[in-house]
A protein has these predicted regions:
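Eukaryote-specific intrinsically disordered, low-complexity regulatory regions enriched
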Residues: 1-148
Length: 148
């Protein structure tokens, strides 16, 4: 559980900083990849933290989702990992499935902010996150219909 506490602390440092730090994002990614067996808890921490942030920090939170999803997708591809959403122990593939489950809520939250700068950044992240997931075409269409 110490790893999950480190993950949450590092995540908060990343999203509350004035600028994204590559070294902190790398540290966050390393902690997450070592803790994939706790996929549900990782996604819960990510989502809960995102929802609690002021609008200005939510874009950094989406960048964290993006970085972690890319790293998980890389592991899935390299190692041929498969995931069963109902398995007791998580892995990179089940992490992606669980992140996919909260994506709609993330995008709805960002769209509700109604900030033009946020929408431009969100459109960039939609493209990146689409590359990490399968079967999110409806979500992408929803997001694109609200973006510039």
């Amino acid at each position: 559980m110490a790893a999950l506490n480190d993950f949450e602390t590092t995540l908060k440092e990343v999203v509350q900083a004035k600028r994204l730090s590559a070294s902190k994002m790398t540290k966050l990614t390393e902690i997450a990849l070592k803790s994939m067996e706790h996929d549900t808890k990782l996604v819960t921490i990510l989502y809960r933290t995102h929802k609690s942030l002021p609008a200005a920090a939510k874009v950094s939170s989406l960048y964290a989702f993006d970085a972690l999803s890319r790293a998980a997708r890389n592991q899935v591809t390299k190692r041929g990992i498969t995931g069963d959403i109902n398995s007791e122990q998580g892995n990179a593939a089940t992490f992606l499935l669980k992140v996919e489950g909260v994506l709609d809520g993330l995008f709805q939250d960002m769209i509700a902010a109604n900030n033009p700068e946020t929408k431009v950044r969100l459109s960039y992240l939609v493209v990146n996150l689409t590359c990490s997931f399968h079967g999110v075409s409806d979500l992408v269409l929803l997001a694109q219909s609200h973006l510039p």
